[in-house]
Swiss-Prot record:
EC main group: ligase
Protein name: Leucine--tRNA ligase
Native organism: Thermosipho melanesiensis (strain DSM 12029 / CIP 104789 / BI429)
Origin organism lineage: Bacteria, Thermotogati, Thermotogota, Thermotogae, Thermotogales
Gene3D superfamilies per the UniProt record, alphabetical: 3.10.20.590, HUPs, Isoleucyl-tRNA Synthetase, Domain 1
Binding residues annotated for ATP, in chain numbering: 583
Segments carrying motif 'HIGH' region: 41-51
Family: Belongs to the class-I aminoacyl-tRNA synthetase family.
Gene: leuS
UniProt-annotated location(s): Cytoplasm
Length: 823
C-alpha cells in the first residue's frame, strides 16, 4: 500500500499549482466575483503559527468559493514600510530595504510551503516605487481638496522610536509598538482631515452588517460623538474668550472655576507674569505623568491657578482659571467649565483647592445639602439656583437652555467628536516621502503628479535622532520649486505606514498599472472586498483609516462604493504556555518545523481544528499529533481500496443492505454539514470533526462488510476527497490523481448532497411511561400513532408498566417519541 509521505507529496503539488498558474485570477469573468483578502503582514521577521492561522482561514474560504463556481481574487502582499522593519534593521545593523526584502523572501517561501492559494502575480510591496508613487498621489488628492494640512500642535512623542505617534498608536499612555511611555512635544506636523468624515464614518457603521458587533462598537466609541453646546467665557481684563464644549449646558449656573489642559496654548496666553516661573515647574511635573492615567477618575487631581479670572456668562461672577492635569487637550476645546456639584472630578479638584461648590440640579427625592456633600450629584433632577429655569426638570430644560444661550449670544448648539485628525508625519527614514516642497517665494507647494514618485534615497544615515533622517541628506532636501523654478527644500518627514495600508486592497486589482493607481472599471467589478480577515487589534487603526480613504476617493469620483470591506472576520490568537507567541518569551512555534515533522496539511488542519477560528486557542503538541494520526488513518483507509475502485465508474449505485444505505447517508450528511459549517460562520473545527466522523464510518464499513460495494466506495472516496481539499489540499490532489483523474481538485466543483440519500428507512422511537423512558422501538419511518401503540403494547417490558392501569393520555411525536400517561 502506498505510504503517506507529506515531504514528497506537498512540494510536488505546489510545483504543479505554480507551473499551471491555477490560482492566477482573470481580470474579468462571466462567473460571479469573490474578493477574498487577509490583512498583509509587516515583513519584520519570520512567520509563526499564529500568523499562519490568518492565512489558512483565508485559504479555506478561497478554495471553497472557487469550487462553488466563483471568480476568486485571493492576493497577498507586504506592509513593508514603517517602524517594525526600520527598528529591526537598526538592531541588526543592516539597511531597512535589504532587511525587508530578505524577510519578504523568507515569508513568501513559508507561505508557499503551507500551500496557500494566492495569486502571486498580484503581489504588492508597499516600499517599492511602483506602489508608493500612488500613496503619494493619494496624499496630493487629499491636499488638493483641503483634506491634508500642516499645523503646529502638541503631539505624542515616543522617546524610544524617536518619532511622533497618532492617538490611535498610544495604548494606556505607551507606544503600541515598543511599550515606551509616551511624552508630549510641540511640532509642526502633517494631518489628514478625517474629522470632516466623522459623521459619515459613524453613520455608515450600521451599514456594515457583515462586521462583528464588537468592532463596530469600538469604532463608534473611538469616533465618540457628543451633542451639547459651545459656550464662550470672557476673560476678565483681557480681550479674549475661552470657548468650552459641554454636554451639560443645564449646569452652567453651577460653574465655579475653569480648567485648561496643560498642553493647551491658552495656558501661556493666560498666565500672569508673576506666576510664569511656578507654572513652568508645574507643567514640567505634569509632563512626566502618564497622560492617560492622570485623566482617570481615581488619579490625584493636580492644578495651578493662572492668576486670571473668567466671567460666568449667565451669572456675571468672576471664576478662577486653573491649569489642571485631568483635562485632555485632545477632547473638545481642551478647556472645561467646571461644575463641582455635578461632576466628580471637578468635585475632587474643588475640595482640594477650596473652590466653592454650588448645587444647580437638586435630587427630586431628597434635597441636597451642599455642606454635607461627599460626592458629586451627576444624575438628572430639578433645576435650582438657575435663574429662569428654576423648578424645571434638567433633561427637559436642556434644549431651552441652548436656545437661551443662542439668543443671548453666549453660546451655540454643537456636536463634538472624540476623533482627532489623523497625524501622518513621521520623523523616520523608512516610509513614503511626503510630496511637498517649501519655497521662500511660493510657500508650501505640492509636487506635480508628473514628478511622482518622490524617491526615497538609499544612502541615508537612518539611526533615530529625533530629527527626520531625510533632513540631513542635502541631495534629497535641495530641489527647485515646481511653481517658480527657484530654490526650494523638500519635506523631510515620511508618511505613517497606516497611509500605505489604507488603500492596498485597491492596488491588488491592477498591481502593475503604471499610469494610474487602479483601473476604474476593474475596481468597480472587484470591489468592495467580499471577505476581509484579520486581527481585531486593527479595529480603530487600519480599518477606520481604510474606510476614510475609500470615502474620500468615492467623493472625488474615483470609486463607486463607499465602504471597502463587505464582511469582516476577526480571528483569535494562538497562545503557547498561556502567552501570546513572541521571540522574547521563547514560546514561538515555527510553521517550518511543523511542516518538516508533520506536513503542511496536518498543520493547516490542526490550526483550524483547535477551536472555533474566532476564539483564542492554546497550542498543543499532542493536538497536532492527533490530527496527523487522523490524516494517516484516512490515507490508509483510502489507499487500502484505491486499486480496486480506480477504474470503477459511478453511474448507478445499488445499495444492497442497511449497512450500505447507512454509509451513503453518512457521506451525504457529511457533505451537507461541512457545506453548512463553512457557509454559516466559518465553523471549520466542526467541519473537520465531520470529516473525522466520516472516516470512522468508512473504517467501520471496511472492517465489517463481507462484500464491498465498489461503486459506493468510489463515490465516497471522490466526494470525501473534494470536501477534504480546502483543509488538506496536497493530500486531496494526490488521492484525486491516483483515482485516475487528469484534472486538479482545485478546478473541480464542490459536491452537492443527495436529498434522497439523507432519507432514513427506519427510526428509533423512544417510549415513555409518565415521562420516564421505558424502552425503544425500531420501526419504519412515519409510522402512525396506532401502529406505534400496537408495537409498544406487544413489547412485554413496556406492557408491564401499563397492565392494570388506566391510560389517561397518549402523546406521539412522529418518528421520535411516544409518551403514555397512566394512573
Amino acid at each position: 500500500m502506498k505510504e503517506y509521505i507529506p515531504g514528497e507529496i506537498e512540494p510536488k503539488w505546489q510545483k504543479v499549482w505554480a507551473e499551471s498558474k491555477v490560482f492566477e485570477t482573470p481580470q474579468r469573468s462571466d462567473k460571479k466575483k469573490f474578493y477574498n483578502l487577509v490583512m498583509f503582514p509587516y515583513p519584520s521577521g519570520t512567520l509563526h503559527v499564529g500568523h499562519v492561522k490568518n492565512y489558512v482561514i483565508g485559504d479555506i474560504v478561497a478554495r471553497y468559493k472557487r469550487m462553488k463556481g466563483y471568480n476568486v481574487l485571493h492576493p497577498f502582499g507586504y506592509d513593508a514600510f514603517g517602524l517594525p522593519a526600520e527598528n529591526a534593521a537598526i538592531k541588526n545593523k543592516i539597511h531597512p530595504e535589504v532587511w525587508t526584502f530578505k524577510n519578504i523572501d523568507i515569508i513568501r517561501n513559508q507561505i508557499k510551503k503551507i500551500g496557500i492559494s494566492y495569486d502571486w502575480s498580484r503581489e504588492v510591496i508597499t516600499c517599492t516605487e511602483e506602489y508608493y508613487k500612488w500613496t503619494q498621489w493619494i496624499f496630493l488628492k487629499l491636499y488638493e481638496n483641503g483634506l491634508a494640512y500642516k499645523k503646529k500642535a502638541a503631539v505624542n512623542w515616543c522617546p524610544s522610536c524617536q518619532t511622533v505617534l497618532a492617538n490611535e498608536q498610544v495604548v494606556d499612555g505607551k507606544c503600541e509598538r515598543c511599550g515606551t511611555e509616551v511624552t508630549m512635544k510641540h511640532l509642526e506636523q502633517w494631518y489628514f482631515k478625517i474629522t470632516d468624515y466623522a459623521e459619515k464614518l459613524l453613520n455608515d457603521i450600521d451599514k456594515l452588517r457583515g462586521w462583528p458587533e464588537n468592532v463596530k462598537i469600538m469604532q463608534k466609541n473611538w469616533i465618540g460623538k457628543s451633542t451639547g453646546a459651545e459656550i464662550d467665557f470672557p476673560v476678565d481684563r483681557l480681550d479674549m474668550k475661552i470657548k468650552v464644549f459641554t454636554t451639560r449646558p443645564d449646569t452652567i449656573w453651577g460653574v465655579t472655576f475653569m480648567a485648561i489642559a496643560p498642553e493647551s496654548p491658552l495656558v501661556e496666553m493666560l498666565v500672569t507674569d508673576e506666576r510664569k516661573d511656578e507654572l513652568s515647574q508645574f507643567l514640567k511635573k505634569v509632563s512626566l505623568e502618564d497622560r492617560f492615567k492622570r485623566t482617570s477618575l481615581e488619579a490625584e487631581k493636580e492644578g495651578f491657578f493662572l492668576g486670571r479670572y473668567a466671567i460666568n456668562p449667565v451669572t456675571g461672577e468672576k471664576i478662577p482659571i486653573y491649569v489642571a492635569n485631568y483635562i485632555l487637550y485632545e477632547y473638545g476645546t481642551g478647556a472645561i467649565m467646571a461644575v463641582p456639584a455635578h461632576d466628580q472630578r471637578d468635585f475632587d479638584f474643588a475640595k482640594k483647592y477650596g473652590i466653592s461648590i454650588r448645587v444647580v440640579i437638586d435630587n427630586p427625592e431628597e434635597s441636597i445639602d451642599v455642606e454635607k456633600m461627599e460626592k458629586a450629584y451627576e444624575e438628572e433632577g430639578i433645576m435650582v439656583n438657575s435663574g429662569p429655569f428654576n423648578g424645571m426638570r434638567s433633561t427637559l430644560a436642556l434644549e431651552k437652555i441652548i436656545e437661551y444661550l443662542e439668543e443671548k449670544g453666549i453660546g451655540k448648539r454643537s456636536v463634538q467628536y472624540k476623533l482627532r485628525d489623523w497625524l501622518i508625519s513621521r520623523q523616520r527614514y523608512w516610509g513614503a516621502p511626503i510630496p511637498i516642497v517649501y519655497c521662500e517665494k511660493c510657500g508650501i507647494v505640492p509636487v506635480p503628479e508628473k514628478d511622482l514618485p518622490v524617491k526615497l534615497p538609499k544612502d541615508v544615515e537612518f539611526l533615530p535622532t529625533g530629527q527626520s533622517p531625510l533632513s540631513l541628506d542635502e541631495q534629497f532636501l535641495n530641489t527647485t520649486c515646481p511653481k517658480c523654478g527657484g530654490p526650494a527644500k523638500r519635506e523631510a518627514d515620511t508618511m505613517d505606514t497606516f497611509v500605505d495600508s489604507s488603500w492596498y486592497y485597491l492596488r491588488y486589482i491592477n498591481p502593475k498599472l503604471e499610469d494610474k493607481p487602479f483601473d476604474t472599471e476593474d475596481i468597480n467589478y472587484w470591489m468592495p472586498v467580499d471577505q476581509y480577515i484579520g486581527g481585531v487589534e486593527h479595529a480603530v487603526l487600519h480599518l477606520l483609516y481604510s474606510r476614510f480613504i475609500t470615502k474620500v476617493l468615492y467623493d472625488l469620483g474615483y470609486l463607486k462604493f463607499e465602504e471597502p470591506f463587505e464582511n469582516l472576520f476577526t480571528q483569535g490568537m494562538i497562545y503557547k504556555d498561556g502567552w501570546k507567541m513572541s521571540k522574547s518569551k521563547g514560546n514561538v512555534v515555527s510553521p517550518d518545523e511543523m511542516i518538516e515533522k508533520y506536513g503542511a496539511d496536518t498543520l493547516r488542519t490542526y490550526i483550524l481544528f483547535m477551536a472555533p477560528p474566532e476564539k483564542d486557542a492554546e497550542w498543543s503538541d499532542a493536538g497536532i499529533e492527533g490530527v496527523n494520526r487522523f490524516l494517516k488513518r484516512l490515507w490508509n483507509n483510502i489507499y487500502s481500496i484505491l486499486p480496486r475502485i480506480k477504474d470503477v465508474k459511478v453511474e448507478k449505485i445499488e445499495l444492497k443492505n442497511k449497512q450500505e444505505k447507512d454509509l451513503r447517508r453518512k457521506l451525504h450528511q457529511s457533505i451537507k454539514k461541512i457545506t453548512e459549517d463553512i457557509e454559516g460562520g466559518f465553523k471549520f473545527n466542526t467541519a473537520i470533526a465531520g470529516l473525522m466522523e466520516l472516516n470512522n464510518n468508512l473504517s467501520e464499513y471496511l472492517n465489517s462488510a463481507k462484500d464491498l460495494n465498489l461503486p459506493l466506495l468510489r463515490e465516497l472516496v471522490e466526494k470525501l476527497t473534494l470536501i477534504l481539499s480546502p483543509f488538506a489540499p496536497h493530500m486531496a490532489e494526490e488521492i484525486w490523481h491516483d483515482l485516475g483523474n487528469d484534472t486538479l481538485v482545485v478546478n473541480e466543483e464542490w459536491p452537492a448532497y443527495d436529498e434522497n440519500a439523507l432519507k432514513v428507512d427506519e427510526v428509533t422511537v423512544i417510549i415513555q411511561i409518565n415521562g420516564k423512558v421505558r424502552g425503544k422501538i425500531q420501526t419504519k419511518v412515519d409510522v402512525s400513532e396506532g401502529e406505534i401503540k400496537k408495537l409498544a403494547f406487544e413489547n412485554a417490558k413496556i406492557a408491564s408498566y401499563v397492565d392494570g392501569r388506566e391510560i389517561v393520555k397518549v402523546i406521539y411525536v412522529k418518528n421520535k417519541l411516544l409518551n403514555i400517561v397512566v394512573k
